[in-house]
Design a protein with these regions (language model features):
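N-terminal helix-turn-helix DNA-binding core of bacterial DNA-binding proteins
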Residues: 8-54, 81, 89, 112-116
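Generic recognition of well-ordered alpha-helical segments
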Residues: 16, 45, 57, 93-96, ...
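Beta-hairpin "wing" of winged helix-turn-helix
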Residues: 63-83
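Hydrophobic residues in alpha-helical membrane-spanning segments
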Residues: 28, 49, 75-79, 94, ...
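Basic amphipathic alpha-helical segments that dock to polyanions
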Residues: 55, 59-62
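C-terminal regulatory/oligomerization modules of transcriptional regulators
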Residues: 1-9, 64, 69, 86-128
Length: 128
């Protein structure tokens, strides 16, 4: 897949980063792929509020930007798996930090914390 054209008029690296990993579901997709390769339906179960269309669009953009790779197996029914590239995996400390920040925010503001949907089998530094 061909890389997307990014319009980085300001030259700001934060702007580029957010244009690549920003989006409603991209950070969650990346976070869940830290654990292991996942099939499309596994991702839809882990991100239940995302429509299949939106999930497909965000997966395509992540693939075009070189953060994930899509493996298609010649089977019936078709089997497709997604996994992080080395470049995508380099986001791990950022994604773990986002999770930790969110957990602190939830705790400080009396919000429920769902370990079930966000655990993804990824150990945080505080859990180790």
């Amino acid at each position: 897949m061909r890389p997307r054209r990014l319009d980085n008029k300001s030259g700001c690296a934060v702007e580029v980063t957010l244009s690549i990993i920003g989006g409603v579901w991209k950070p969650l997709i990346l976070f869940h792929l830290l654990e292991k390769k996942l099939r499309f339906m596994q991702l839809t179960r882990r991100i239940p509020n995302a429509t299949q269309r939106m999930l497909t669009l965000q997966l395509r953009e992540l693939e075009a930007d070189g953060l994930i790779v899509r493996h298609v197996f010649p089977e019936v029914p078709p089997k497709v798996e997604y996994e992080l590239t080395d470049y995508g995996r380099s986001l791990e400390p950022i994604l773990i930090s986002l999770r930790q920040w969110g957990e602190g925010y939830q705790r400080d503001h009396g919000m429920a914390v769902s370990q079930r949907l966000c655990a993804a089998g990824v150990e945080t530094a505080s859990a180790a």
